[in-house]
Each structure stands twice: as structure tokens, then as C-alpha cells.
A protein has these predicted regions:
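N-terminal topogenic membrane-targeting module
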Residues: 1-70
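Cytosol-/stroma-facing membrane-proximal "stalk/adaptor" domains immediately downstream
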Residues: 67-130
């Protein structure tokens, strides 16, 4: 039996206004949101391959864990925020990878990394409003 990976929980409710903005989300934002909020099979962790490609996963035990997500409106744009527990990867490493994160999840988004709490990092992907 393949490993079962539970959906990542929303950490705050999505408002109707933000739901309305989903139509402006990029294909990648929509795909990431749908992938991490459903059961997955045969995967070690949510976004494990992505974190590896971004150089943020030295090994399985030190890989950051996607612990939650939420959707919001930033500057009038749809924004998907991924929340990671990152006890082994320092925040400055996340900041250093920000351009790579933006390129990986782009085009059509800007990426912002922020430290939410000790060892917690948020990656906000904001859709570029044309």
C-alpha cells in the first residue's frame, strides 16, 4: 500500500472576496492549491520534489514541512500563502532562494518569503495583476 498523505489544512477561512479573485489565479497557483488540499498517494511529503529542486531540502529529515495554507487579497491581487515548518533551514536561506521560488512558480506571480514565527516560514505567491 502506497504512503497516504493527508490534505494540508487551511489556517484561516477564505472570504467570498478572495474566492471571487480565484479566477485571476495563475494555472500554477490553482494546481498547487488543489494538489496540497487533497489526499496524495506515493509521495513522501507535500511539495517534496519542489523543495528539492529549489535547494531547500537537503534530505528527508531536514525538509521543511508544509503545515498550512491560506488565500488572501494583497494589493487587490489573488495571493496563495504556503506555510512551512522549517526547523532545519534558516530563514536567510529561504530569502536567498526567493528569486528561484518566483521563477519556479511563475510566470505571472511575485513571490515573497516571510518569517511568521520561530522556524516558521510563509511563501506568498501573488498573481500579477495585468
Amino acid at each position: 500500500r502506497a504512503a497516504e498523505l493527508a490534505p494540508v489544512p487551511y489556517t484561516q477561512p477564505t472570504t467570498d472576496a478572495v474566492v471571487a479573485l480565484r479566477e485571476h489565479a495563475t494555472q500554477t497557483q490553482t494546481q498547487v492549491r488543489k494538489d496540497v488540499t487533497r489526499y496524495r498517494y506515493g509521495q513522501e511529503a507535500h511539495l517534496d520534489e519542489t523543495l528539492e529542486r529549489l535547494g531547500l531540502s537537503p534530505n528527508d529529515t531536514q525538509r521543511p514541512v508544509l503545515s498550512g495554507l491560506h488565500e488572501e487579497q494583497r494589493d487587490g491581487a489573488y495571493t496563495l500563502v504556503l506555510e512551512f515548518d522549517s526547523p532545519f533551514i534558516e530563514f536567510d536561506k529561504w530569502q536567498e532562494k526567493q528569486p528561484k521560488i518566483e521563477a519556479f512558480f511563475g510566470p505571472g506571480i511575485t513571490a515573497e518569503v516571510s518569517q511568521e514565527a520561530d522556524k516558521k516560514v510563509a511563501v506568498a505567491m501573488k498573481a500579477v495583476v495585468a
